[in-house]
């Protein structure tokens, strides 16, 4: 299999790099010492810290897509792909509160069995509900850019909720893509392995 970069995939890579570098520049503009940093300042700092000071590398493996049966006609769900073959790579870190930050890129087969790349930033507030500190629950969001075949691979911004169940280096992470009847309303999950 030969990987070739089309003009659309180049646009995706450039959009992702622009997204990261924009926040890198924002983080360089420090807030005055006597004021709390703004939302944009904190976001820029988190992106910059994750980009420059990551603690682990991550392998992403998509494992399931589920189209909400209450919001789709059966003939649609019978045609859709719910096995999102693909893979991804990212870097991540835990902050001083133990919360997770990541920069990632992933490509997978979408509902129409077409390749869909996505890249962006992920954040999860982490809880350790048991004495075993290796078991963690996470709740947060992902913000980034994706490209879809049915949108002619135009870069589309995404902001989605994210939740996880983690044990040691393995995480089961998921998001829900909201939508309307016969559109959106998709549960998407993947495994993340830290190495």
Curated annotation (Swiss-Prot):
Keywords from the UniProt entry: Acyltransferase, Cell outer membrane, Membrane, Signal, Transferase
UniProt-listed InterPro entries: LipidA_acyl_PagP, OMP/PagP_b-brl
Entry GO terms, CC: cell outer membrane
Positions marked as site (Role in the phospholipid gating): 181
Presence of the UniProt keyword Acyltransferase in the record: yes
Domain of life: Bacteria
A molecular-function term among this protein's GO annotations: acyltransferase activity
Catalytic class of the enzyme: transferase
Record-annotated disulphide pairs: none
Catalytic activity reported: a lipid A + a 1,2-diacyl-sn-glycero-3-phosphocholine = a hepta-acyl lipid A + a 2-acyl-sn-glycero-3-phosphocholine; a lipid IVA + a 1,2-diacyl-sn-glycero-3-phosphocholine = a lipid IVB + a 2-acyl-sn-glycero-3-phosphocholine; a lipid IIA + a 1,2-diacyl-sn-glycero-3-phosphocholine = a lipid IIB + a 2-acyl-sn-glycero-3-phosphocholine
Pfam families (alphabetical): PagP
GO-annotated biological processes: lipid A biosynthetic process
Function summary: Transfers a fatty acid residue from the sn-1 position of a phospholipid to the N-linked hydroxyfatty acid chain on the proximal unit of lipid A or its precursors.
Protein name (Swiss-Prot/TrEMBL): Lipid A acyltransferase PagP
Gene name of this polypeptide: pagP
């Amino acid at each position: 299999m030969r990987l070739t970069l089309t003009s659309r995939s180049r646009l995706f890579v450039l959009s992702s790099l622009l997204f990261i570098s924009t926040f890198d520049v924002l983080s360089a503009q420090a807030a005055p010492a006597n004021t709390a940093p703004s939302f944009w300042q904190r976001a820029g700092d988190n992106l910059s810290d994750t980009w420059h000071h990551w603690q682990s590398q991550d392998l992403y493996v998509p494992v399931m897509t589920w189209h909400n049966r209450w919001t789709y006609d059966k003939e649609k769900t019978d045609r859709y792909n719910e096995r999102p073959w693909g893979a991804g790579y990212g870097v991540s870190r835990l902050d001083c509160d133990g919360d997770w930050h990541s920069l990632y890129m992933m490509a997978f087969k979408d509902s129409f069995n077409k390749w869909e790349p996505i890249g962006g930033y992920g954040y999860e507030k982490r809880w350790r509900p048991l004495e075993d500190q290796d078991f963690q629950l996470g709740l947060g969001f992902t913000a980034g850019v994706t490209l879809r075949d049915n949108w002619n691979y135009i870069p589309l911004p995404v902001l989605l909720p994210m939740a996880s169940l983690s044990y040691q280096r393995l995480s089961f992470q998921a998001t829900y893509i909201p939508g309307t009847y016969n559109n959106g309303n998709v549960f998407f999950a993947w495994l993340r392995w830290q190495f």
